[in-house]
Amino acid sequence: MAASSLPSHNSKFEPKLERAQIAWSEEGVPTSTMFDDVYYSKLDGLAEVNYIFLKHNQLPERFETLLPNSRFCILETGFGAGLNFLTTCLLWLEKSPADAQLHFISLEKFPLTRSELAKAHHAFEEVSEPSNALLDVYPLHLPGWHDVFLYDQRIRLTLWFGHVMKGLPEFDVQVDAWFLDGFTPRKNPDMWQSELYLQMARLSNEATTFATFTAAGDVRRGLAQYGFEVEKAPGYAQKREMCFGRYAHSRPFSSKAPWFERAKGGHPSPKKAIVIGAGLAGATVAYQLASQGLSVTVLEQEKAVAQQASGNLAGAIHPLVTADWNVRSQFYLKGFECSLRWLRPWFDSHSIVGQQNGLMQLAMTETMLQRLQEALTRVGLPKSFAYWCDADQASDLIGQKTDHEGLFFPEAGWVQPTSVVTQCLAHEAIALKQEEAVVSIQPVPDQNSQDWQIMTPNSTYQADVVVVATGALNGDLNEQLNLPIRPVKGQVSHFKAADLKGALKTTVTHRGYSVCGDFGAQSPYAAISGATFEAPDLSPILSDASHIENQRLATEALPNWLADSTDMAGKVGFRPTTPDHLPLIGAVPDFEWMKTAYFEQSHTHAVYRYAEQRYQPGLYVSNGHGARGLMSVFLAAEMIGAMVTGDAQVMPKSLYHAVHPARFAIRHWRSGKR
C-alpha cells in the first residue's frame, strides 16, 4: 500500500518532498515505518493487485472491448512500490487495441527512489519488463506533476509527488477507474476524508468504477455520500472484506475559476491546421499537430524561418529554480522536462545541433547566491537534478577560471534553435509558405462552418484550426487577439576560435549566457555570448556598445576566457515578452462575450454565478515565450495539440491558469478596476 496526505486547500505549499521511511523484511517486502504497514501483501503482491484492482474494476473485459484509438484513464491514490501500475501495464499490453492509450495517474506523498523501486520489484519476475521501462524514465524527486511515457506512448504515466489534496484539484480528466490504495484508514486517516470522495465524484462519470482493499465503514459511507454505489467482497488473503463499486450519479460541479476553464472537447474532427509564424513556437506546434495526423500549413512573413530570437546560434536549456517553488518554477520545470523529452532523440540521432553538456548557473550577486542556495535546501533539489559548486569546483566543470560559486544542472545544455525549427518543419505533413504576411484572421462567412479564413497579400487560406505564433513584432495581429505582447530587443555576440583563450566544457549562465560548440559547417564561429535587454529600442542594427556589454558580462564571470578582439559579430532579435514573464498559450477566448459575461458584471459575485469561459472555436495562440522559449515552446505545442484533439491535460490546472491568454484582462476585472 502507499501513502498520500489530505491537507486543507489553504495550507501553505511546502515544496520539499518527504522521503519514504522503509524497512525491508527478510523476504524483501518493504514496510513503511511511518505507518507501520506493508506496501503489498507478503503472500503475493501481484495476485493481490489482480484480485483487488483489476478484477473488481472489470479491467480485463473493459480493456478487451475498447474501440480503436480509445483512451482509458485510471487514477490511483498512492503509487507506493508501483506494483499496481506494472500489473496494469501487462494487462493493457495484452488486452487493449494497439493504438489505444492508457493514462495512469498516481499521487504519492512519499515517493520511493529509483533504487528502492528496483529492489521492491526484484522478487516479481513477471513484471521485469515494465519495471525496466518504468525505471528508465522514472522522474526526479521534485514536487508536483511529472509525465513519462512507456511503450511508444501506448502508456502515459502521470505522477503527482506531494499531498493528494494538493494534487487532485489540479486534474481535469474523466476517470474510468479508481484504485483507492494507501495505507489503512486507521493508520492514515488524513487521506480518507470526505474531500477525497468529493474530488472522486468531480472526476467521475456514470461509467466510472472503483476498487479498494478496505471495507471500513467510514470509507463506505463517505463513498456513498458522494454518489458511489458500494458493494463488499471477500478481501485478499488475511483481509476479511474489501469494497468496490461505481459512480451512480451525474451532477454538475461549479468551477472555482470559471474564466480559466479549459476549452472542452476540441474540434470534432480536425483535419487542416494553419500555423502563423515559423519560429520556435510555430515550428514546434506545427510538428505536434502534424504528428497527430493533421495536414499543416505554416505561414511565415520573412524570406527564411527563425529570423528573430529563434535564429540565434545557440540557446541555453535549463530550469528556473526558486526558494518558494512558485508558479514560474513549476511551469519551467515542466517545460524543461518536456524539452528534454523532445530533444534527446534528436541529439542522439544528430538531427539537431546542440549538446546536453550540463549548465553552470553562476551566482553573480549576493542576492542570486542566497536565492540559489535557498532553492537547493528548501526545495531539496536532488543531486541528479542540481548540486552546488564552490568556485574551484565550478572552474573545473566549466574548464575556465571563475571566482563565483554556482548551481550545476547535469541534464541541461544548449541547442541551436534554427536546427530545431528545420527539424520540425521537415515533417512530411507540413507545408511551409514564406513571404506570406497575414493581414487578417476571420471566421468563414458560413454559419454551418467553424473554419477560419486567413488573408495574406498573396493568397487566402482556410483551415479548421489556426495557431498564432507570430512572436514580438506583429503588433496588429497581437492587438486583434488582445495579446499584451511587448518586443524586447536582444543582441548576442559571436566569437571565432581566435577570439577565445580556451573552450567552455559546459554551458554557462551568469548575467547572460555563454556557449562554446560546433554550430554547424556553415558557421565560422566557436562561441556565443549574450544577450542584452534593450527595451524599448526596436532598431535591428548591431551595436558596438551591446557587443562591449556582452564581453564585459562574460569576462566578469569568466575572466580568462575571451581574448582581446575588435572583430565584432553577432545577431539582433526581438523577444516577445509579457508583463508577468510567462507565455500566452492555449485557446483564444471570445473577448466580446467576456465583456457581457464578466467585465460588465460585478467582480464580487460568488464564482458559481459566472458562466464558464467561452472560446473562439479552433483558434489558438503560442506567444510571449520571452528569453526562456526553449523551456516553454515544446510544452506549449503539447498543450495546444491536446486541446485541438480533446486529449487529456498535459500539466496542472494552476499552470494552465498561469499562461491563459485572457489572464491579464481577468486579473484587471477581478481587482475591481474598470
Swiss-Prot record:
InterPro entries with a match to the protein in the record: FAD-dep_OxRdtase, FAD/NAD-bd_sf, MnmC-like_methylTransf, SAM-dependent_MTases_sf, tRNA_MAMT_biosynth_bifunc_MnmC, tRNA_MNMC2, tRNA_S-uridine_synth_MnmC_C
Region: FAD-dependent cmnm(5)s(2)U34 oxidoreductase, residue numbers: 276-674
EC number of this enzyme: 2.1.1.61, 1.5.-.-
Region of interest (tRNA (mnm(5)s(2)U34)-methyltransferase), residue spans: 1-248
Superkingdom of origin: Bacteria
Major localization class: cytoplasm
Single biological process term from Gene Ontology: tRNA wobble base modification
Catalytic reactions of this protein: 5-aminomethyl-2-thiouridine(34) in tRNA + S-adenosyl-L-methionine = 5-methylaminomethyl-2-thiouridine(34) in tRNA + S-adenosyl-L-homocysteine + H(+)
MF-aspect GO terms: flavin adenine dinucleotide binding; oxidoreductase activity, acting on the CH-NH group of donors; tRNA (5-methylaminomethyl-2-thiouridylate)(34)-methyltransferase activity
Subcellular location: Cytoplasm
UniProt entry keywords in alphabetical sequence: Cytoplasm, FAD, Flavoprotein, Methyltransferase, Multifunctional enzyme, Oxidoreductase, S-adenosyl-L-methionine, Transferase, tRNA processing
Methyltransferase in keyword set: yes
Cellular-component GO terms for this entry: cytoplasm
UniProt xrefs under Pfam families: DAO, Methyltransf_30
Cofactor(s) required for function per UniProt: FAD
HAMAP family per UniProt: MnmC
Main function: Catalyzes the last two steps in the biosynthesis of 5-methylaminomethyl-2-thiouridine (mnm(5)s(2)U) at the wobble position (U34) in tRNA. Catalyzes the FAD-dependent demodification of cmnm(5)s(2)U34 to nm(5)s(2)U34, followed by the transfer of a methyl group from S-adenosyl-L-methionine to nm(5)s(2)U34, to form mnm(5)s(2)U34.
PANTHER family documented for this protein: SARCOSINE DEHYDROGENASE-RELATED, TRNA 5-METHYLAMINOMETHYL-2-THIOURIDINE BIOSYNTHESIS BIFUNCTIONAL PROTEIN MNMC
Protein family (similarity comment): In the N-terminal section; belongs to the methyltransferase superfamily. tRNA (mnm(5)s(2)U34)-methyltransferase family. In the C-terminal section; belongs to the DAO family.
Name of the protein this chain belongs to: tRNA 5-methylaminomethyl-2-thiouridine biosynthesis bifunctional protein MnmC
Species this protein is from: Hydrogenovibrio crunogenus (strain DSM 25203 / XCL-2) (Thiomicrospira crunogena)
